[in-house]
Amino acid sequence: MWGCPLGLLLLLLAGQAALEARRSRWRRELAPGLHLRGIRDAGGRYCQEQDMCCRGRADECALPYLGATCYCDLFCNRTVSDCCPDFWDFCLGIPPPFPPVQGCMHAGRIYPIFGTYWENCNRCTCHEKGQWECDQEPCLVDPAMIKAINRGNYGWQAGNHSAFWGMTLDEGIRYRLGTIRPSSSVMNMNEIYTVLGQGEVLPTAFEASEKWPNLIHEPLDQGNCAGSWAFSTAAVASDRVSIHSLGHMTPILSPQNLLSCDTHHQKGCRGGRLDGAWWFLRRRGVVSDNCYPFSGREQNDEASPTPRCMMHSRAMGRGKRQATSRCPNSQVDSNDIYQVTPVYRLASDEKEIMKELMENGPVQALMEVHEDFFLYQRGIYSHTPVSQGRPEQYRRHGTHSVKITGWGEETLPDGRTIKYWTAANSWGPWWGERGHFRIVRGINECDIETFVLGVWGRVGMEDMGHH
């Protein structure tokens, strides 16, 4: 009793398949020709690559071609052609009836021979056979890395920072860091240990801006100046002078003063050492950022000299200095010189750093920056393994310096508790968490607990009264 309906069902299915086949044929016959404006990718090997030439009409004898479909069957050679570019030469042994496009196609536009466009950090050049050749440099903003980090359970989110788009990873390392690793003698300088009182317990969270409101300054932007040595030093000194003067002096100190005037074994926007920066702040001092503003974010060209020093001072006795030059910023009159006492190194111990930070203010830390750090947007950073299987040029790192401002803990959705440091970078407020980042605490992540420095602002009673 089921025979008749089953036969009818099979007949209907066969009819539907035939209709779909006719629709497919109609779509091909009604499609516009692929080469009406000339053959694009005239040197491409399509039929030849697959060793495919088909007789008559064979709709399955097809290959993808620049977002469309091309064919290697005899039927393609009709008035409105949808043949693959090498069909005539490879299958028929004759020249193609359409002229090759004199240039290369990209995003609907034809570029002339030797024309170029940029694909992120790589330049693509149109060559004579209508083919693009692109550089293969690792880019600072790597969309594949961003996806891999955000798919993984790493505790932080990555994203595209528009200021980094178009830069190579090598340029990021060269221009966005700039702290030269200290010499072995400096790395071996004696560590200072603080003393925790009996039964003293440090809080689980602390932020310098909460203990010293209005005395902790926001991050600046070093741009493409490899001057983190100057920016982090000025940032820590600014906060410490403000704290130790009890708010009587709250300067944002000038990184440019260090970049241009601290020239002994320093390279300005091409890198510098922390010990040299602190020596200069102790012996010479610097003015405020308003008085001597950052003069530009592109001071790293090897052929261009560091901008000349525009701030000079003289000794006043007892180590104090007085400016002998007017402010480079003619709109500012105050050219007060700010100084610090000798810098000291903290023990490479989590609690030692916490105690110092809580009692005396933000500290300066050296750290190793890896390729994924540039992509940080939010969360608790730790270096990820997403680039481990890639060539060495995709796995780069360099030395940087930052200002640690606090610490805390966070419980993740899986129940794990992660301890972290809060730190201020020098890439501007658009990067990370309003210019700051959090990084795993207690395991020396990226060597951030290896070389940590503190200092006292040089503040006398005359300074308190003067200000």
From Swiss-Prot:
The free-text function statement in the UniProt record for this protein reads:
May be implicated in the adrenocortical zonation and in mechanisms for repressing the CYP11B1 gene expression in adrenocortical cells. This is a non catalytic peptidase C1 family protein.
Question: Is Secreted among this UniProt entry's keywords?
Answer: yes
Query: What are the protein's UniProt keywords?
Result: Disulfide bond, Glycoprotein, Secreted, Signal
What are the SMB domain coordinates in residue numbering?
49-96
Q: Gene that codes for this?
A: Tinagl1
How would you describe the post-translational modification of this protein? Glycosylated.
Annotated S-S bridges: C53-C72, C70-C72, C70-C84, C76-C83, C84-C91
Q: Per the similarity annotation, which family is this?
A: Belongs to the peptidase C1 family.
Organism, as annotated: Rattus norvegicus
The record, for InterPro entries, names: Papain-like_cys_pep_sf (IPR038765), Pept_his_AS (IPR025660), Peptidase_C1A (IPR013128), Peptidase_C1A_C (IPR000668), Somatomedin_B_dom (IPR001212)
Per its record, how is this protein called by name? Tubulointerstitial nephritis antigen-like
